[in-house]
Amino acid sequence: MEYEFRRNSLTGTYLASFSMDHEVLGQWFSEELGPELAKIQQVLDIIKDIQAGKRDSWRLIGGDLTLDLDEEQARIYANALGFEQEYELEESMSLYDAESEAYCGLEDLEEALLSWYKFVEKGR
């Protein structure tokens, strides 16, 4: 999983871009976490708790995206995917694509979060 972080020098906006099949992580980092160091640290602390066996799983529901963590992986998905559909969507209208949902290993997410934390902290 590859990623790149940028900061718009005019607006001060922090942006994260992730490799194919993980694009939604970039949106989650940029929009749901943003430059809030306390929120980033909260997720890092939860990951440590899960790795230490203090928790089995954890969920953070954001404005547009949700993060689910368990002992093995992280899942980030659009909140719209969490609702059951009463009818079948046409294949071309499917919500399940790389821009709506992604999985990665817990350690991979932890590494990316640490990098994001350092990037944001450095830019202040």
From Swiss-Prot:
Entry-linked Pfam families: UPF0231 (PF06062)
Disulfide bonds: none
Family: Belongs to the UPF0231 family.
Identification of the protein by name: UPF0231 protein Shewmr7_3366
